[in-house]
Amino acid sequence: MPFDEINREFSFPLQKIIDEQKLEVIYMPEDGENTLISDHEINRPGLQFAGFYEYFDKQRIQVLGKTEWAYLNTLEPEVRRSRIDNLLSYKFPALMVTRNLEIFPELLESAKSNEMPLLRTEESTSVFTSKLVNFLNLQLAPRITRHGVLIEIYGEGVLILGESGVGKSETAIE
């Protein structure tokens, strides 16, 4: 019986996070709620706003917290727009803003032009990221499905495994 099923990649739709985490939808492109999430890690894009993209993983959800927001707030609107456009051009699954922070007009415009889901939560960044990572780990955890029947023989548990339809249940009948 092959055990390579555990290496299978899992994914789920973005809408599941929106519902579970009770996120406010600021902007959702057409069919954006069906964007598939397949990475259990997240990214805080502070270094990317500063221009460093060498190890940037565009498969991850991006979480913008107070630190990133404060940095963007120090920039002139044209520079802020450029930095935001550059980040959102990478087409990651979604951008989530924490602490009910104000959405910069440049951020909303860029989300629309890049067809990027833009979501917001009132939770603090550390609480939200902890909940989100736990949720992602649960949804994307490796799993295996096996066909079997569990029986007791002289007080010991025995698990009979086999392909579907080969007679495991019939074997277990007394």
What are these regions (language model features)?
Residues 156-174:
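Glycine-rich phosphate-binding P-loop
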Residues 86, 110, 174:
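Hydrophobic/aromatic ligand-binding patch that stacks against planar heteroaromatic rings
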Residues 75-79, 99, 103, 143:
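Short secondary-structure boundary/capping elements
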Residues 60-63, 93-96, 116-119, 157-159:
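Structural motif
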Residues 136-155:
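P-loop NTPase nucleotide-binding/switch module
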Residues 2-87:
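Gly/Thr-rich phosphate-binding loop signature of adenosyl cofactor/nucleotide-binding cores
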Residues 91-94, 100-136:
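Charged, amphipathic alpha-helical linker segments immediately N-terminal to NTP-binding catalytic cores
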Residues 65-67, 99-100, 122, 154-156, ...:
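Fold-independent oxyanion-binding glycine-rich loops
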